[in-house]
């Protein structure tokens, strides 16, 4: 999957660990949306 920046990772993509994965059809079971204002396409989810 494509990594994405969770709210808990910090304010900027540069220099922070991207702990989320972008899911196009919503977060799968057992995952949660980790970005309040998430990517333009899909959802930024993490386990």
Swiss-Prot record:
Q: Where in the cell is it found?
A: Secreted; Nematocyst
Which of UniProt's keywords are assigned here?
Disulfide bond, Nematocyst, Secreted
Keyword Disulfide bond present in the record's keywords: the answer is yes
Q: One GO molecular-function annotation for this sequence?
A: sodium channel regulator activity
Coiled-coil ranges (or none):
none
A GO term from the CC aspect: extracellular region
The UniProt similarity line reads: Belongs to the sea anemone sodium channel inhibitory toxin family. Type I subfamily.
Recall the taxonomic lineage recorded for the source organism.
Answer: Eukaryota, Metazoa, Cnidaria, Anthozoa, Hexacorallia
| Disulfide bonds listed in the record | 4-44, 6-34, 27-45
General remark: Is not active against sodium channels (Nav).
This protein is called what? Delta-actitoxin-Axm1g
Q: Which GO terms describe its biological process?
A: regulation of signal transduction
InterPro entries of this UniProt entry? Anenome_toxin (IPR000693), Myo_ane_neurotoxin_sf (IPR023355)
Q: Name one Pfam family in it.
A: Toxin_4
